[in-house]
Amino acid sequence: MSRPELKVSLGIWALSAMVTRFVPAGYQPEAGAESTAEKVRRAVAGLDGIVDDYEFHYPQELSEENLDEVREALDGHGIYCICAGTHLNPRFGKGGLSSPDDATRDAALEEALRGVDFAASLGAHFILWPGVEGYNYPFQTSYAECWARFIDGVEAIARRCEAGGIKLFLEHKNSEPAMKIFMRNIGMCLHVIHTLRARGVTNVQVNMDWQHLLMNGEHLPEYAALLHAEGLLGHQHANSGWGTFDDDNMVGATAFMETLELALELRRADYGSRGERLGLDLYPYTEDQVAAVRRSVEQWRFIDSVAARIDEPALRAAQADKDAVRAYELVYAALGAPAPAPAPGA
């Protein structure tokens, strides 16, 4: 299955100070002193030929105030996505779109809509990861009321995206910063999308953050295939991790086979032919940040090249019989394993 190489977008937060609750100044505090434009210059200088476009949170990383400076630093590279920065504002620690307090909810929605308008002015899509929309304790939340407020808020954002001619990508996660995020799995994400479809809103797709799925035990290639079948496969946030926390490690560092099968399913979906990107959502705590991004892209390109070498007709035949042994023979052949020895008596 041949196709042009996927274009890559990078979340600029990969070059941040790497803050944790244990190290509030960050493992790389020198990056905390950089402006967004300085981070972009560092990325562009070290990732020539590796990264095509960039992604930013609004208004914390990119806004009307620093747009000209950042555009100059981008040196011709594009801005592919603007991400809602609600979770970065302490005012919304107990929820923004879902807040039962009208003033808080109005402020969160107004900030998100400003972000949508900003994204539309750039021709960029908008990502909503509702990490603060949830709860931390039993008995803390009026679930039905807060869910209704949340979905109504997402609808308002989606309709503003539609008016601006851009897509809204929803991204789920099970926990952090809210301990129980409302939209915590693929099923709840699809619930939101299908509720919006019933209201006539059709410009919403899914941003698959790989580690968020792995944290849930959600098999990456299965959900890519499902989302593609429903026309919902919008964007990827590529990374890896151990599976229990949002590690945002380099692509292909763990979950290798899952990532390889995902590469195959993305090829089957012709992902990239409609302008989609492989977005990188990385948090290299202690590693050289630019080197970690470069290594992620190089490892992805290798994994994708293996997927391209898998004998697709033969694999389809094996899958029609649910023949796992034959399927792995084909996968390992693509990885360069020697041909299997003949069975005794064959």
What are these regions (language model features)?
Residues P4-G26, G85-S99, P130-P138:
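N-terminal small/glycine-rich loop or linker at the start of catalytic domains
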Residues M1-A45, M183, G187-M208, H212-A346:
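Histidine-acidic metal/acid-base catalytic patches
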Residues D52-E55, I127-L128, H237, G279:
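Conserved beta-strand positions in the central sheet of alpha/beta enzyme cores
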Residues D52-V70, Y137:
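Glycine-rich, proline-tolerant flexible connector loops at the mouths of alpha/beta enzymes
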Residues T36, G49-Q60, L88-N89:
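Active-site loop/lid in soluble adenylation, ligation, and acyl-transfer enzymes
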Residues P4-L10, D75-L88, A120-P130, I166, ...:
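Short coil-to-beta-strand
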Residues M1-R3, L62-G78, L109-L122, I151-E162, ...:
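Short amphipathic alpha-helices and their capping/turn segments at secondary-structure boundaries
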Residues S2-P4, K94-Q205, M215, E329-G336:
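Active-site acidic/histidine proton-transfer and metal-coordination neighborhood
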